């Protein structure tokens, strides 16, 4: 070859590599309202991790509403998860953390298809993790958003404060926050992250007017909060609740300052007792300052999912500003955002109970005792443990999901119900049904991360099916779109559910548990509603 031509070809090759490099760099960057970010590309998916959506909630910002991020100059690396929120990791967590927890934790993550540009207006999905409000984070491998991005979704996951960092009340906090932005800091974090999405997701190619929120367990309960909070107005257009209850019985809610007769203590009184346990007396400014100076480990204590039912921790509360009422009261009053909803539970979901006998168990149904016996134990020969679990699971998880779907269907909003009955091939000798949270790696199609060498082709097929339904719902509001098995809308008349079965894939059917849920609904609906919380002055959200 002529030397001159070699030089030209070499120059062209170098230019091509340079242009490719520039193109990749451009594709891996995004400009937010706080500064520029540089992400990473893996398998044709771009991710931006550890993106701050609020100032670190430390020091004087402990127990305050999320505050604006301090802008940065230059381009910030966004290639690794930032710390999950402060907690004592739970050894048998279904979603083990990938970071060391820290109080400085208000960060989110974004995945998108490679080559996505600002203005592409891809649908957005916003994930809220579970963990009983004391555990969880956005770093677990099973929460990786890559498979959603591969389906044309801009996927977002965000941290929120946990334990006493996320839920805490104290008399001086009430005095210094007359606008009512107190107590439920975890929910404020979720709203702040959604507001960040509204302001910034277009820079990542997402459509801020097409956001679907979804969460599991405590994350699902959080979705109920968002559906019924005035501060979440307009931040999303669809919602998915996985094993998140739907009445007032999941979050253990209480009021900030008021203790109800025969009800739980006020959150403030719990905060005062916690302060005393730390050697801090009084309820004024000096006491609050001392509380804010406590080491994070002291505030955290030993709280996790195994120890959360202990004195000194309030959990979610009704504050009259962020959370106006428990979900059941809000839904029955018509105080929820009119959006399509998809809800469901697992076939062996949470159902713990302590009734010592069948007589005690069925006595709890009052005048519906006979109907309950016929629905749950028609032969009278079922083991107590199995019947007790089914009764408590239905009351805690399954019937509340149907209740919410019924409310939305009555408002002519699309509502869809699922039951996840599939059990991984490697776990079938151990699990008689699908336990709580086991649907997550199928929804995310991260079964490889969950089961590794024990993964079977059937597991992968179910994961692909569930992912496709969730994506279809996020894109169109109808999970049937593009899927081989139609998912009928739920109505009280048809009671149709989509069962992700152990052996037959997705099956749409009339709910075989209808009689169980009907009798459970009869006793739950007859319970007196919770009274309204004390009034607080209305004010606009800070962010």
Spans of model-derived segments:
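Positively charged n-region of N-terminal signal peptides that target proteins for export
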Residues: 1-6, 397
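Non-catalytic accessory segments of hydrolases
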Residues: 2, 25-184, 453-466, 475-484, ...
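Bacterial N-terminal signal peptides
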Residues: 10-23
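Serine-hydrolase-like catalytic core of hydrolytic proteins
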Residues: 90-281, 321-325, 329-356, 410-413, ...
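Short, solvent-exposed turn/loop segments enriched in Gly/Ser/Thr/Pro and often Arg
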Residues: 161-164, 214-218, 419-426, 485-491
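Surface-exposed patches in mature extracellular/periplasmic domains of secreted proteins
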Residues: 209-212, 279-290, 302, 417-421, ...
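Substrate-gating cap/lid region and adjacent catalytic-acid/histidine neighborhood
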Residues: 238, 250-251, 256, 286-458, ...
């Amino acid at each position: 070859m002529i030397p001159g031509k070699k030089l030209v070809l070499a120059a062209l090759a170098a230019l091509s590599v340079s242009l490719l490099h520039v193109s990749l760099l451009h594709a891996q960057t995004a400009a937010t309202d706080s500064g520029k970010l540089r992400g990473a590309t893996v398998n044709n998916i771009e991710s931006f991790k550890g993106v701050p959506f609020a100032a670190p909630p430390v020091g004087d910002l402990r127990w305050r509403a999320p505050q604006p991020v301090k802008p940065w100059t230059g381009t910030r690396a966004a290639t690794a998860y930032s710390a999950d929120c402060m907690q004592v990791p739970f050894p048998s967590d279904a979603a083990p953390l990938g970071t060391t927890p820290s109080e400085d934790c208000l960060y989110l993550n974004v995945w998108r298809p490679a080559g996505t540009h600002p203005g592409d207006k891809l649908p957005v999905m916003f994930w809220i993790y579970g963990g009983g409000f004391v555990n969880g984070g956005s770093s677990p491998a099973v929460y990786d958003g890559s498979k959603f991005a591969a389906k044309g979704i801009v996927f977002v996951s965000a941290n929120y404060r946990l334990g006493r960092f996320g839920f805490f009340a104290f008399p001086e906090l009430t005095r210094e926050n007359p606008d009512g932005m107190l107590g439920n800091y975890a929910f404020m974090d979720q709203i702040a992250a959604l507001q960040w999405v509204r302001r910034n997701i277009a820079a990542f190619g997402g459509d801020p007017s097409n956001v679907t929120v979804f969460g599991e367990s405590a994350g699902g309960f959080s979705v109920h909060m968002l559906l019924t909070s005035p501060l979440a107005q307009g931040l999303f257009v669809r919602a998915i609740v996985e094993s998140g209850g739907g009445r007032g019985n999941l979050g253990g809610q209480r009021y900030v300052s008021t203790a109800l007769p025969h009800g739980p203590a006020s959150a403030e009184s719990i905060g005062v007792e916690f302060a005393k346990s730390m050697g801090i007396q009084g309820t004024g400014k000096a006491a609050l300052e001392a509380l804010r100076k406590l080491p994070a480990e002291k505030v955290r204590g030993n709280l996790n999912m195994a120890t959360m039912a202990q004195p000194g921790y309030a959990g979610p509360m009704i504050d009259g500003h962020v959370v106006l009422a428990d979900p059941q009261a809000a839904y029955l009053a018509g105080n929820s955002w009119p959006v399509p909803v998809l809800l469901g539970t697992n076939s062996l979901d949470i159902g713990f109970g302590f009734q010592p006998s069948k007589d005690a168990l069925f006595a709890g149904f009052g005048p519906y005792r006979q109907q309950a016996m016929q629905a749950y134990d028609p032969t009278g020969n079922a083991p107590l443990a199995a019947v007790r679990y089914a009764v408590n699971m239905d009351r805690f998880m399954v019937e509340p999901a149907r209740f919410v779907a019924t409310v939305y269907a009555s408002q002519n909003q699309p509502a869809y119900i699922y039951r996840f009955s599939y059990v991984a091939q490697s776990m079938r000798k151990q699990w008689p049904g699908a336990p709580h949270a086991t649907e997550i790696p199928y929804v995310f199609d991260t079964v490889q991360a969950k089961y590794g060498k024990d993964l079977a082709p059937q597991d992968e097929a179910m994961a692909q099916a569930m992912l496709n339904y969730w994506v279809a719902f996020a894109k169109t509001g109808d999970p049937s779109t593009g899927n081989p098995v139609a998912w009928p809308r739920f109505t009280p008349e048809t009671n149709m559910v989509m069962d992700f079965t152990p052996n037959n894939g997705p099956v749409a059917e009339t709910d075989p548990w209808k009689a169980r849920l009907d009798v459970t609904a009869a006793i739950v609906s007859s319970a007196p509603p919770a009274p309204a919380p004390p009034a607080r002055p209305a004010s606009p959200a800070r962010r």
